[in-house]
Amino acid sequence: MTVSGKAGGRSSVKGPGPLLSSVIVATVAVVIAFILYLYAIILTGSLVKVWGVNNEITLENYSYVFTHGSKAIKDTLLIACIGTPLGGLLAVLVGYATARLKVRGSRILETVSLLNYTLPGTVVGIAYIIAFNDKPIMLTGTIYILVAAYLFRYSSAGIRNVIAALSQIDPSIEEASRSLGASSVKTFTSITIPLVLPAILAGMRYLFIHSMTAISATIFLVSVHWTLITTRILECMTELQFAQACAFSIVLIVLVFIASGVINLLARALCRSGDAIGVH
């Protein structure tokens, strides 16, 4: 028996009436306009000399960002690029152990992996400082504590995505592969991974974006050796350098949009490759 997912009869559920549709459209339009207004304010602020005092158009703020803030940009991208693939790997391992292996304690592993995200960022930052500020594992002031904080805090979305994707895949597909002589590793890499790849990439994108934009835990973990764009924005705001803070924000927004676009293109390319392999 094949379940196509198509309705077998005419649906009796009616859509919203004209009045309700107009209200929904108007509400969405107001929200979108407000978001675009905020982006426009930040962009405008990044192009003036002194916000509210000297509104002469200038690019000096961006020159400041790429001269005095180049290290923060490099560090932010490096940490995000290191943590993102590790987050994808962690999501696959925890998700597969929970949804497929069902080993003893797998639910506890899932709960613990999600618990880190439910805690406030300030609590997480302080906890990492206390936990890794002394031997045998001393990570304070290094890149490793930042990567670990982002990895274990923001990989929860990827874990949930993988678990949800695996729960929708019939285990008999993998059993059929193994019954035809494929090893467990071959089945995992050739069958399971391609099927849950969109969920993995969605989780990786979530982790990358939050690694770029996180601030609550970050302010406790940065050091003179490692600084991030978000902390530079905070520094500019505390020093009343609003134009420079806006310029840093625009650079961060552009980087996040570029990263999201690249991951989307990668997802489409990999999905097409998977479809081509399936056809052949």
Predicted features along the sequence, with ranges:
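Interhelical loop and adjacent transmembrane-helix boundary motif
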Residues: 1, 15-20, 46-71, 212-264
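Membrane-embedded alpha-helices of multi-pass transport/permease systems
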Residues: 37-40, 44-47, 89-93, 126, ...
